[in-house]
Amino acid sequence: MAQIKADEITKLIRSQIENYETKIAVDEVGTVMSIGDGIARVYGIDKVMAGELLAFPHGVAGIAMNLDEDQVGAVLLGEYTAIKEGDEVKRTKRIMSVPVGEAMIGRVVNALGQPIDDKGPIVTDKFNPVERIAPGVIDRQPVREPMATGLKAIDAMIPVGRGQRELIIGDRQTGKTAVALDTIINSKGKNLICVYVAIGQKRSSVAQVVKMLEDNGAMEYSIVVVASASDPAPMQYIAPYSGTAIAEYFRDSGRHALCIYDDLSKQAAAYREISLLLRRPPGREAYPGDVFYLHSRLLERSSKLSDKLGGGSITALPIIETQAGDVSAYIPTNVISITDGQIYLETDLFNSGVRPAVNVGLSVSRVGFSAAIKAMKQVGASLKLELAQYRELAAFSQFGSDLDKATQAQLNRGQRLVEILKQDQFQPLPFSKQITIIFAGTNGLLDDLEVKDVRPFEKALYEYVESANPQLFRTIEEKKALDDAIKADMTKTIKEAKERFLSDRKAAKAGA
């Protein structure tokens, strides 16, 4: 029989007592009282914070939105069908955050920052809160650097600056997304990180956008955040905030970011759905009372930081879809009053072949002109004036047939100016080319061309300058202003290009 050694047992017990650690895991938990339509009512978590992340069973997260006296109304971010009444809910004691950093570039993520592009996990140890207070007045500086879109109609007459919020507004199928995507493509090599947030769109449409960005080499500096039409309303509601949080990382590191929200009408509809399910009192058009704050707190985060904070910026291009051109509806008027201007796209212009279909009369940029380069201001000011006069005369000329020579000449020039502002999709132009063709139009150098020949001539002009006088484009880019010598050189080159173009046309007709 084995002998029991008391000293060994004592030694063993002593070592176990010495190494004993008293660990008590304390979680604040509540109970699901009712669940349905992506909304859970939870009892027992009295000390929860507004907007706090809650842990539900089966790995589903929720956000505490309604803090009532005896219960908490939470919205669920994911598949909630497996959650049932009586399930346990834990507090996480943290506000929702998304992963940020260099690893996000080139990726397609959902509203929680999780990758959905089958390219593996995103490896980063940096996180930004989804909701964040916008920079204060002292932390900002005025908009003074241009943010080129590559579109003649916008860069010349409605310029956008870094740190600006410029609304793109119009009916469905007027080219709103195309304007935003042209801006992304034009940002190549300009030290700009682009964040495209797709809210409530068809997945096929988003896949098309991603494919187009890849084909144009734009995914190398872009991030796509997706909350599609099939995602729960809470995901569509937080997607723009997640996109901004991702962009803020680049702004805070002294770089420049562009945020496109496509579109905020669907985010407002998702927020209305959540609010009505949470039994918040409805207001105008059934939207809750704080729907203005929904968009203002989002768009105020786009800013140009002071040099002391690194001088980084976020430029916002929110998109709003109108119904039958009604810009006086609730959400459009809200966002117009928050932003620094709007680009209004019109169905009639789009259908008549004017693309981008920018209505220059209703579009405005409230701060962009202080950011525009001098050369663009020089040609853009006269362009806007001549187009305004043309529209007035065009409306007037419908009533009378006998027009004097001056009026007829102005109408003819207006037709050519409308023609030079047309541009093919995904063909953004550098400032130098835009300035050259607008200079030609506003100085009457295209008046003797047929209207149908204006666009073919524009293409021929760029080719001629690049082969015969490439220094012209370089000089405009470097000096950023037009002096008499540059104007004389431009006039001479444009006239030479026109002579060659007309002689080529004549020869082609003779040969035919």
From Swiss-Prot:
It comes from Koribacter versatilis (strain Ellin345). The keyword tRNA-binding does not apply. The keyword Membrane applies. It is found in: Cell inner membrane. The record marks 363 as: Required for activity. Keywords: ATP synthesis, ATP-binding, Cell inner membrane, Cell membrane, CF(1), Hydrogen ion transport, Ion transport, Membrane, Nucleotide-binding, Translocase, Transport. It catalyses: ATP + H2O + 4 H(+)(in) = ADP + phosphate + 5 H(+)(out). Produces ATP from ADP in the presence of a proton gradient across the membrane. The alpha chain is a regulatory subunit. Its EC number is 7.1.2.2. GO terms for cellular component: plasma membrane; proton-transporting ATP synthase complex. ATP binds at residues 170-177. This is ATP synthase subunit alpha. F-type ATPases have 2 components, CF(1) - the catalytic core - and CF(0) - the membrane proton channel. CF(1) has five subunits: alpha(3), beta(3), gamma(1), delta(1), epsilon(1). CF(0) has three main subunits: a(1), b(2) and c(9-12). The alpha and beta chains form an alternating ring which encloses part of the gamma chain. CF(1) is attached to CF(0) by a central stalk formed by the gamma and epsilon chains, while a peripheral stalk is formed by the delta and b chains. It is a peripheral membrane protein. SUPFAM superfamilies: C-terminal domain of alpha and beta subunits of F1 ATP synthase (SSF47917), N-terminal domain of alpha and beta subunits of F1 ATP synthase (SSF50615), P-loop containing nucleoside triphosphate hydrolases (SSF52540). Belongs to the ATPase alpha/beta chains family. PANTHER family: ATP SYNTHASE SUBUNIT ALPHA, MITOCHONDRIAL. GO terms for molecular function: ADP binding; ATP binding; proton-transporting ATP synthase activity, rotational mechanism.
